[in-house]
Amino acid sequence: MVSVPFIYSCEGNDPQVKPEIAVRVNPVEATGGDQFMSVTASGNWSIAVKDQSGGPLSWVSVKPSSGYGSMSNVILTVEKNNGESARTAILELTADGNRTTVALTQQGTKESGGSEDVVVPEGCPDLRKVGWLEIPGIPEGTKLGHFSHSMTIGLVKTRNYSYSWDYDNYVAPWVAYPLSKWNIGNNIKRDDRDDPWAVDPYLSEKQQPVLYMRGFRSTSSRRYDRGHQLPSADRLYDYSSNDKTFYGTNITPQLSKLNQHFWAKLEGKVRSWAGSSDTCYVVTGCLTEGSTEYALDNVGKKITVPSHYYKAVLRYSRSTTLGFAGYMGCAILLEHRDYGNGSNFKEYAISIDELEKKTGIDFYPNLSKLIGKEAAAKVEAQDPKTINWWW
């Protein structure tokens, strides 16, 4: 795979640069589709698409096929491969009197598809065994996938976020992560123009939303944003940790009026809780049961629009007199709709126990190992509306 770790959309005349082509997704799924590729050059350039013998071919196209200076928004279009075998195209860049090539491979129908193709990179932990407080219970025989991304703070490698994956609806039923001043950070700033939307390397392009060219396309009059489950603003320690929040597996089609107002304020509220705690163990998720709506990703896949969103927060503070053994819990469950510009989160607050009943998910199963079953049960049963600290 030829990739670029961070691509800006600004073009220009780059003096004395080596001509290069960078393709984000290579090999390409049999289903084909569009993606951005980048060209690095300091003058006029052109791209020719050839087969392996140097002849023309028609199943790959590039637009524009010529230009001046570096560009990061060249559109590479690959048609669907109906054959069982893979096929290869040669992209030949001519610039500044030099030529360079990239071999683009498209998989055949025998090589693409299903959850059996999941490749978990070495070092991805077994979430049933890690014992992290934020990880929900994982039932035996589940059809969901479970993955975890890491980050490095200073010299310390730690977890960024973990998630379950619904291969049928193309969304994460839950995304779990620790939240504290330490891992939120405040070292970088993002501009909407340079948001690094990308596919998650744990899954094939066919198994997740492809959103790096543009946002969701609605099939109705409703407008959907690329809504984060782990917010980008929760990972501002460095670009590497923040980039991972833009993976398709962390994104759902979320109503713009919810994402940009009430939900954004709720995300800020959770960060404020973390800032006043040692650590908050957060689970953000969505429900798809009963949903009949979908939005289209950049290659036309139908991504289920969630019917509800929720947040579960387990707060720990060693110096608090609230809660039980330093822990207390709060959950918020929302229908997927417009809540206006308000911020009355208390109205939608419920206990962890109540959220478990609504979702069928066992939250914080590892808490009892730390503080005992009785204290853990009290944490999960506590009504957050009665605790002023949250509000």
Language-model segments: residues:
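C-terminal motif of bacterial Sec signal peptides marking the signal peptidase cleavage site
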Residues: 6-9
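Domain-level detector for secreted/extracellular nuclease and nuclease-toxin modules, and
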Residues: 11-14, 92, 104-391
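Solvent-exposed, low-complexity, repeat-rich "mucin-like" stalks and linkers
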Residues: 11-15, 22-52
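Short, solvent-exposed loop/turn segments enriched in Ser/Thr/Gly
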Residues: 31-37, 82-90, 156-158
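Intrinsic-disorder/low-complexity, polar/charged segments enriched in Ser/Thr/Lys/Arg/Asp/Glu/Gln
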Residues: 32-36, 71-73, 99-101, 160
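Surface-exposed binding patches on compact interaction domains or structured appendages
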Residues: 42-75
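A short beta-strand micro-motif common to beta-rich folds, especially ectodomain repeats
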Residues: 74-76, 84-97
